A protein has these predicted regions:
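Alpha/beta-hydrolase
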Residues: 169-257
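Structural recognition of the beta-strand scaffold that forms the well-ordered cores
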Residues: 65-67, 96-100, 156-158, 180-183
Length: 257
């Protein structure tokens, strides 16, 4: 597990706790941008693309630090506009920090159903075009002066994990409008069944911990790969997952907890 993931997980938990006590001031959003549903067709239909922006530190010539929240509802990360390394960087550079939601997450829904036709626009190509469109056409409602367009305004795209992939790919695909990218733990080379991700844990973790993990995996696999429904159901019940019919869904839920 990467240090970035651990740090961002801790920060997300802290900010989630913070949001239960505090409310992000309305001057930071959320705001909504009219985004094309399909950037690569003649259809002009748009959806409301949600984002937050902190312009407090901005002075003329400052950059925009743009973070696409990736595969979560972005309100979970809205506090990043005031409390994050991005916010610190924006203050240091007299810039703006923006958190934007990924299409099909949170309130940024190009469609109200999950049909195959609707989900055809849920892909990386469209997500990158969303960011490019956002950079090109953005008008910030909480900024009193006009923000010069890119490349006059330097856009720094930020992210970690999948969001980091987007940052790196934006710099590669749209260099004319993206000045720089700061991707962390970004596996930009796609790999099917990327078991190597877990290999450093096996190789460098404490022996007793690795043995315990191996024993648990072996035990659970023995149950899930059997044809005996009773022990499978008992295992799911123990983890509060009795509602999950498919074993791969059960494994995915436990992996992400």
């Amino acid at each position: 597990m990467s240090p970035y993931f651990l740090n961002s997980k801790i920060l997300s938990q802290q900010l989630s706790s913070q949001t239960t006590k505090d409310k992000l001031p309305e001057k930071y959003g959320p705001f909504y941008f009219d985004q094309p549903v399909d950037h690569f067709s003649s259809d002009t239909t748009t959806f409301k693309h949600r984002y937050w922006a902190n312009t407090d530190a901005y002075t003329a010539g400052g950059p925009v630090i743009l973070y696409n929240a990736g595969e979560v509802a972005a309100d979970e990360r809205s506090f990043y506009v005031i409390n994050s390394s991005m916010a610190e960087l924006a203050r240091e550079l007299n810039g703006i920090v923006i958190v934007m939601e990924h299409r099909f997450y949170g309130e940024s829904m190009p469609a109200l159903n999950y049909s195959a036709k609707s989900l055809a626009t849920l892909n990386t190509k469209q997500a990158l075009a969303d960011i490019a469109s956002f950079i090109t056409d953005l008008k910030l409602p909480n900024l009193d002066i006009e923000l010069p367009s890119a490349p006059e305004t330097k856009y720094i795209v930020y992210g970690g994990s999948y969001s980091g992939n987007l940052a790196a790919w934006m710099r590669q695909k749209y260099p004319q409008i993206v000045f720089a990218a700061i991707p962390s733990s970004a596996p930009v080379q796609m790999s099917y069944n990327f078991y190597q991700y877990f290999d450093p844990i096996r190789r460098y973790g404490p022996d007793h911990c690795i043995q315990a993990i191996h024993s648990v995996i072996t035990y659970v696999d023995h149950i899930l790969f059997s044809s005996l429904q009773h022990p499978i159901s008992a295992l799911k019940n123990k983890f509060g997952a009795a509602d999950l019919e498919h074993n791969d869904d059960f494994a995915e839920r436990k992996l992400n907890q």
